[in-house]
A protein has these predicted regions:
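Flavin (primarily FAD) cofactor-binding/catalytic cores of flavoenzymes
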Residues: 1-30, 34-36, 65-167, 171-345
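Short, flexible, mixed-charge acidic loops at enzyme active sites
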Residues: 42-54, 199-201
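Glycine-rich flavin
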Residues: 49-64, 212-213
Length: 345
């Protein structure tokens, strides 16, 4: 049994695989557990309180009502792997995964690994996406994807454009208003929820209607997926300008959907990620390179995905939610293992 990825999804898978008594191995390209979190922007704070950020079996340390930073999360993941003695092989990048005669082979930069079942747990963040027209910006305009942003000092003084505004983009834009003249370009207006309401975290209130536990195949889940709210951020109350979608760029000038233009000295592309599954030599992706699955179970027996955005619910890619999907997949893996064992005799 091979688990590719040792972030929060892979570690949660390892926890439940321990309970199946199946032999398994986790591999990860990073030099240490929690590396992806440590390389995020310095001011990152989770929008879920610590009490909602626990993987199965280990509470998140500290005040249950505080909002952890990126280093807190990285440290927690390392402690989690130690606590449950999970078998993690680091600095091992999988460059190809293919199948032959019912066995999967993961080609890595440290040799080949073979398994009868594979969990692909590389997470919701694939390859950073920047629109193709960004190449038409003048070389003098500093461009950063949000994955490469660390702090305001990276950017030259003056006017900054933040393109795209999920929760990370909103946090970055808020931070930059203290040091720069900030414009935010929004593809669409997003619903906003306060971080706290009447003295309680918004997630405490949402529990009453199980808002973030609605599956993607329900009407409310489908609506939420298309209207993911910003939490704890009110951009209109900040010292920044809000523009519509960016449609193009030439030189130092950016064009917006409403026909207006403006020039900037720097652009932060908070435009998300794309698949990053080019190494998968298996029929488990659609024509856009996205995983084909039903709650992580693919049409190829023995191949599973874990940690995807909206894999089952809004919480699927969150620290406090991935465990439910991991438990579900561990049960399916155990069932498939026994079916195969019975068939093979």
């Amino acid at each position: 049994m091979l688990v590719i990825g040792a972030g929060q999804a892979g570690l949660a898978a390892g926890y439940f695989l321990r309970h199946t008594n199946l032999r398994f191995q986790l591999v990860d390209a990073a030099p240490e557990i929690g590396h992806v979190w440590q390389t995020r922007y310095d001011s990152l704070r989770l929008f879920t309180p610590a009490k909602r950020n626990a993987l199965p079996g280990l509470p998140f340390p500290g005040d249950p009502e505080h909002y952890p930073g990126k280093d807190d999360v990285a440290g927690y993941l390392r402690a989690y792997a130690r606590t449950f003695a999970l078998p993690v092989q680091l600095a091992t990048r999988v460059t190809r995964l293919h199948a032959r005669d019912g066995t999967f082979t993961a080609v890595t930069d440290r040799g080949a690994l073979r398994a009868r079942q594979v969990v692909i747990a590389v997470g919701a963040f694939g390859v950073p996406f920047i629109p193709p027209f960004a190449r038409h910006l003048d070389p003098g305009v500093l461009q950063l994807h949000s994955s490469a942003y660390r702090h305001p000092a990276q950017l030259p003084a003056g006017r900054v454009l933040v393109v795209g505004c999920g929760n990370s983009g909103a946090q970055i834009a808020e931070e930059l208003t203290r040091t720069h003249q900030v414009t935010v370009a929004l593809g669409r207006r997003q619903p906003r929820l306060p971080q706290r309401l009447l003295g309680r975290d918004i997630f405490d209130w949402s529990d009453r209607v199980r808002l973030f536990d609605r599956s993607v195949d329900t009407p409310l889940g489908a609506f939420l997926r298309g209207h993911d709210p910003l939490i704890g951020t009110n951009l209109t109350a900040r010292k920044l300008k809000v523009r519509p979608r960016v449609t193009g760029a030439v030189g130092r000038v950016v064009h917006f959907e409403d026909g207006t233009v403006a020039s900037f000295g720097a652009v932060v592309w908070a435009t998300g990620y794309r698949g990053g599954y080019a190494w998968l030599d298996l029929p488990v992706l659609n024509d856009r390179g996205e995983p084909l699955h039903a709650r992580g179970v693919t049409s190829v027996p023995g191949v599973y995905f874990l940690g995807l955005s909206w894999q089952h619910t809004r919480s699927s890619a969150l620290l406090g939610g991935v465990g439910r999907d991991a438990e579900y997949l561990a049960e399916r893996i155990f069932e498939e293992h026994h079916r195969r064992s019975a068939r093979d005799g």
